[in-house]
């Protein structure tokens, strides 16, 4: 006789990989800004000058769209926090760069994978609503 004990429902997690292949310096600088922006919003901040407590990191509302409209074929995702980020500067297996400038040599391709966790536990009721 086997018995299973129900303990909890884990928060759903989602990973989204984004590969960037900038064609020029302007696009390369935009990739750098995107990566810094996600890093910034992933982390908490101190709530006071004594640095004894944190404020929660930014929340994200992820929605799938197709041609400007919500894509109802893909389940909805409730509000999330970003729980991880991996940046791969050797997307093709080898590290390749543009010509160096005064800052160094920027990578030709970059893959940023962002991991998100929902802040709401899913139930049968939320799944029935399209989540």
PLM features: residue spans?
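Acidic, Ser/Thr- and Gly-enriched intrinsically disordered low-complexity segments
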Residues: 1-131
């Amino acid at each position: 006789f086997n018995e299973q004990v129900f303990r909890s429902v884990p928060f759903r997690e989602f990973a989204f990989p984004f590969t960037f292949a900038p064609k020029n310096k302007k696009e390369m600088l935009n990739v750098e800004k995107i990566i810094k922006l996600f890093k910034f919003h992933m982390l908490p901040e101190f709530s006071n000058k004594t640095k004894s407590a944190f404020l929660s990191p930014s929340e994200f509302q992820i929605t799938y769209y197709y041609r400007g409209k919500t894509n109802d074929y893909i389940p909805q995702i409730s509000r999330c926090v970003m729980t991880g980020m991996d940046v791969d500067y050797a997307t093709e297996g080898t590290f390749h760069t543009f010509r160096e400038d005064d800052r160094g040599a920027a990578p030709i391709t970059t893959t940023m994978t962002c991991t998100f966790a929902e802040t709401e536990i899913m139930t049968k009721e939320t799944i029935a609503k399209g989540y």
